[in-house]
């Protein structure tokens, strides 16, 4: 079984913690999936619950603009789960980054410890947020008005998410067309529609997809919608709403949310 390099307890974990929660533990999960062919066993190995592993894989897939795992059916072992080529490449890059940075930190440990400003910068490079939906993309359009500004972020599958913010906020973020950005939407802001009944909605953001997972809770549930480009949109609904819509895996539904519900994050210079 392959093993991942050990992580440094200070700067290395911060420097190599990629966007969202793509850290040593996450890549240990990918490595375990590659070794076991099972999300359940891999989650246990990496210290995740089964549900937590699924949610992290879906969220991370949005940030890297592609699915990280795929299901294999049939065969001698009866099928299972394996990493997609994108995930295999990501895991290989992570290992190489770890190797190079471990070497660097071991050579320069004393020097780095004398530069607290640099250490702080490395730690700030990893953003943490409670928003369930996080989509990495590129700013493709900016419509600036005297009071509000509309920003379009193009994500996987050429899907466009429109965000509305104050022009003051847009200026503060120094938004530019072609810049990388992350669109964040809380799951509670997403409405699922299964039948428009001939009506049109005013909400700017409407994404049709397929229900890929329903996680029922005591009162409310999470519904994951897979979009044509492979991104996953999560909506938080009451159990009564799920029953009323008769939501089930494989069903087509449309995720709807207002432009005002979208937050945009960009890396500052």
Curated annotation (Swiss-Prot):
A biological process from GO: regulation of DNA-templated transcription
UniProt domain Mop: residue ranges: 128-194, 200-266
Pfam families associated with the record: TOBE
Keyword field: Molybdenum, Repeat, Transport
GO molecular function, one term: molybdenum ion binding
InterPro entries for this protein: Mo/tungstate-bd_C_term_dom, ModE, Molybdate_resp_trans_reg, Mop_domain, Transp-assoc_OB_typ1, WH-like_DNA-bd_sf, WH_DNA-bd_sf
Lineage: superkingdom: Bacteria
Annotated function: Involved in the transport of molybdenum into the cell. May have a role in the early intracellular capture or metabolism of molybdenum.
Family according to the record: Belongs to the ModE family.
Annotated protein name in UniProt: Molybdenum transport protein ModE
Gene: modE
